[in-house]
């Protein structure tokens, strides 16, 4: 994800939880 955290803040708008 873009930022290390538990919120949907990536380019896809899904909850990735900073896994990618």
Curated annotation (Swiss-Prot):
Keyword Hydrolase assigned: no
Domain of life assignment: Eukaryota
Tissue expression per record: Expressed by the venom gland.
Cellular localisation: Secreted
Complexes and interactors: Toxin b is a heterodimer composed of toxin alpha and toxin beta.
Function text: Binds to sodium channels (Nav) and affects the channel activation process.
Protein name: Toxin b subunit beta
């Amino acid at each position: 994800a873009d930022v290390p955290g538990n919120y949907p803040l990536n380019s896809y708008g899904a909850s990735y939880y900073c896994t990618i």
